Amino acid sequence: MIELIPAIDLLNGQCVRLTKGDYDQKKVYNDNPAEVAKDFEKLGFKRLHVVDLDGAKSKHIVNDAVLKAITTETNLTVDFGGGIKTGEDIEKAFAAGASMVTVGSIAVTNPDLFMEWIDKYGADKLILGADVRNGKISINGWKEDSSEDLLPFLKKYIDKGVRYVLCTEISKDGTLQGPAIELYKEVMAAYPQLHLIASGGVSCNEDIEALEAAGIPAVVFGKAFYEGKIDVEKLGVK
């Protein structure tokens, strides 16, 4: 069974979704993210993906208090990303109750620091965020594209023990146009040992079923749930 991970994106302390990472195209779904997290837990979900959009934009963690509220008020296993740029940021995230931290930009801009974190915290506490636009890794809240190609970028860290990769196809994110299944199949064919988490574009139960049929281990979804396009009962969440 594919692992199902709902997402909460935080902006100004609210639960929002963007379209293709565009801060000007935001939709607010709830003013109380901790209540949203509790609702996910009641539905039977065990995991939660939390993104600090303020942090991604300002290049340091911002919403650690909201993260703390979520981890205090639920028993969900929370992974947290957005604005993790320094040792202080990552410590704050873990102190606020994150079980895992998603790191993207630093793995591109400061690989030595990311390697240090792998050594310090262990590869099982870190998710490598690989946000892709036109085949290149994008950084800093998706505002900049790097020169890094996806597969070589992943290999560099897989060789260091990284097993968890959250891969977002930016052109799909928040569009409800279906996930980039061919991209994920390409990654899994190259690195079958990866615990790949697909993200972006999920629009319905059938998209999740298609990812499962393609052998993708896990999926993050947000807008499709908030817009009522996913039937949780049919997903078989217990």
Name these PLM-found stretches.
Residues M1-L4, G44-R47, T74-V78, A98-S99, ...:
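Short, well-ordered coil/turn segments that N-cap beta-strands
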Residues E3-L4, G55-T71, K85-E91, S105-I127, ...:
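Active-site-adjacent beta->alpha loops and helix N-cap segments on the catalytic face
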Residues I8, D52, S105-I106, A130-V132, ...:
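Short secondary-structure boundary segments
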Residues D9, F40, L48, A93, ...:
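Conserved, mostly hydrophobic/aromatic
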Residues G13-C15, T19-D24, A98-D173:
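Conserved anion-binding
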Residues C15-I61:
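N-terminal beta-alpha supersecondary unit
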Residues Y29-E41, T86-E91, D145-K156:
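Short, acidic/polar
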Residues T74, V78-V101, E182-A218:
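Catalytic cores of alpha/beta
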